[in-house]
């Protein structure tokens, strides 16, 4: 094996030819070795040519020794093509993060668009420099077919082999292999046709930092830290399911191709040069260390409001909010809302209670959950309650209850319950 090592490391032709690609986790041949090749990755044909070369010039024929020597050589000679690309960029000082989606796709030049794009691009960079880092966001472009959404993401990935749109189903047994070796992965229209259950699966999928699986010829499974980021495209405006917790992993941006300065495919060279400088700007921010993988609280709040325009319509919230805006009391409970606001009779079932709690805790303006149980009087009795924002919480009695009968008496019950 030592003789094989010497040949691979000292022969003028072979020296430096073999490198371990940390993105694909495959051996790459990075120089011309004199035989015809169709791809950079080392394959069975390359091994045959290498063995023939070593036998002819060095008399080395033990294929196991050659393979082990090659493993040692590439372990010492690793590289990451995306990191090398990013490290080699030099920014010209012109701001592009703020304008890129307007330039190519006609998106508004809003602060929300800027913060969403910046977060996503920094996440892409962080994922290749720190594989497996926590990054849960998906940038979603929403707009007409033919606007160039997928082409933009393909160009954003720089090389076609660093981009994939082959991830169609979350339950595909080959889903992890389809992710491997790619930087930006598009889930085209997956959200637009997804059910609430499948969207929850997508959220869980986005939250993972690694995959554990065994390749076909490996003996044991191993952890593979994620180096990719996910993007979404949709022609459907309200592509997000109703989720009153906010669908926070998704960063939707509305595009309008009629307002774009240029179509991304109009001049490929100019588009790619623009995107090179986009990544150069991102790297200046990344190297500064003045960034975070979390949105500032005020931006996160605006994003929650922004996402509502892309979610399925929430009619129940509107009914409850309108009723509360005209309600004279300062305290409400779920059963009171069920009977009075939603005009239902009797006791609510668990599903209805959970929905009301979800609405009151996440989407209603001007009301806060109270820390104690409240006595509402007949027919509601003691209930967990919400109080009007700005109302000072009274002191609970010795049993931990607060009487709100006076507020409740202001209501006129139009029916028996």
Where are these regions (language model features)?
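Conserved helicase/translocase motor-coupling segment
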Residues: 324, 331, 336-358
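A short helix-turn-beta junction within AAA+ P-loop NTPase domains corresponding to the substrate/partner-engaging
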Residues: 240-260
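AAA+/SF3 P-loop NTPase mechanochemical coupling elements
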Residues: 175-180, 215-233
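P-loop NTPase catalytic core of nucleic-acid-dependent motor ATPases
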Residues: 70-180, 184, 335, 342
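Conserved alpha/beta core segments of nucleic-acid transaction machinery
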Residues: 285-329
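N-terminal nucleic-acid engagement/recognition segments and initiation subdomains in replication
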Residues: 1-95, 111, 115, 346-351, ...
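Conserved AAA+/SF3 P-loop NTPase catalytic/coupling segment centered on the Walker-B
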Residues: 183-206, 241-246
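Conserved catalytic/switch belt of AAA+ P-loop NTPases
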Residues: 199-222
